[in-house]
Structures are given as C-alpha cells and as structure tokens.
Amino acid sequence: MTRTDDTAAADQARFVAYCKQRKVNCMIVGLFNYLGDVKSSLPVPSYSCEHITRVDILSNGLVTLCCMDTEGKFGWGDASKESILDIYNGPRARAYRAMHRQGRRKQIPPCGTCNLFWPSFDGLSWPRRVQFGFAYAYYLLRYRPFIKHTASFPASSPSP
C-alpha cells in the first residue's frame, strides 16, 4: 500500500487486516519522489539504489533506468534492436551504476530527486558496503519510511 498525506490510519489498519486474513505479507510505504513532483519529507539517500542492478523493459522494448521511468525518458536502449546483456553492459547503464556506487546518486538525473530508500550493495568494495550499510541503517532509523504489518497496529484491527 502506498501511503499519501490523506491516508487515514484506519485505512492502513484495514489493509493490514485484509492482508493478515489472507496470510499475505504486506508493506505500507510513503509515496516516493521520483522526478521532484511529489511532496515528500524524505530526503534522497546517499547510498546506491537497488534499481541500478535491475532491468526494466517497457512493452515497446525500451529498457528503462528503473520501474519508475514508465515512459522511457531515461532509457538505456531498445531490447527489440539489441541484446539485453549489451544494453545492461552499455555505457549509459554503466554510467548510472558508477555514479551510484561512488556515492554520487544525487548528481545524476532523475536519481538526484528520487528518495526511494532500498539500497544496492552489488558491485561495491567492502569499505563502501560498510559505509552504505551504515547510511542505510541511519536512514531507516531517522525516517522510518515504511511500516511492516506487525508494527503499531493492534491485533483487533477492523476487517475490510
């Protein structure tokens, strides 16, 4: 569930109860600020994003930066014209991964405005993994951007 400013605590409780009833793990997250269009108090993390090691392909074949790039504005290539492996290892994809791994996420568009907080530790040296691990832990402790189904809801939550 994506929580917005007008999401009521009762709505979240009903969602949690609905998921528990069906024995499904759930997560409630805040709305991420991908292109700077969403009002959010969460800052852009300093560590690398999990999306830099994924491949997201739109229905038209465009390989995008991440799942948030639904129109392919930050595309890496076209899977209908070249292999996915070539695109993944291509210069644009490598440049994004390098910037993230160097701790320069905030300097590359659109990542510089995106506050998605899940990290990627792939391809990092051990010192950088430790550094980003501490940064991630601090981010979670300071901002607590998600609520797991076991947190802060009474067992007698109302049913949907």
PLM regions and their residue ranges:
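Short, structured coil/loop segments at alpha-helix boundaries
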Residues: 8-9, 21, 127, 137
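Conserved strand-turn element in the central/C-terminal portion of the radical SAM core barrel
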Residues: 1-9
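Radical SAM enzyme core and accessory elements
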Residues: 102-160
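Short, acidic, Ser/Thr-enriched surface-loop or helix-capping motifs
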Residues: 57-58
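Short, small/polar residue-rich loop motifs at catalytic or cofactor-binding pockets
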Residues: 49-52
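Histidine/acidic residue-rich metal-binding segments in metalloenzymes
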Residues: 12
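C-terminal accessory region of radical SAM enzymes
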Residues: 16-40, 62, 68-121
